[in-house]
Amino acid sequence: MLFLMAVMVSFSAICFASHGTDLDAEEKIVDQFFAGKDYNKVTAFMDPSLAKDLTAERYNNMFTEMNKDLGKMTEKNLRVYQVFDDGHVLSYAAKFEKGAVLALDVVFKAEKGKFSIVNFRIFDPTAQAPAQADNKAEKK
């Protein structure tokens, strides 16, 4: 019985090892990207379509504005790891110096064992669309 349990645990560990390696690599990329320091290093991990839209100037301005409004990111906790045939989505709860807790989604494309950021977004998960806020105000 003990042998059977050991085999089952070993087999499940082997099956999930690939996602663990992928996740580790992607989290390192997220850390480098959101450090907001060296655009030239970050472009190595960006999909060409994202690199075309997110120029060095826009990247630097994004972090200047974020630091001014939110402060630096102090902590991020992985909440969801979604796996698709052609990539992954990592969703975090991100805490900032000025107290805000925002959601951070990073979309990766996987090609030949290499990962590149295709898109990302930082948003307030508690924010409501204006129409929803107006409807709630009318009901009161």
Indicate where each model-derived feature is located:
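Compositionally biased non-globular segments, especially hydrophobic aliphatic-rich helices
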Residues: V9, F16, Q132-D134
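Bacterial N-terminal signal peptides
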Residues: L2-S12
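Exposed beta-sheet edge and beta->alpha loop/turn motif
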Residues: Y81-K140
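Short solvent-exposed beta->alpha transition segments
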Residues: D24, N40-G87
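Generic anion/oxyanion-binding catalytic loop in active/binding sites
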Residues: A6, D31, P48
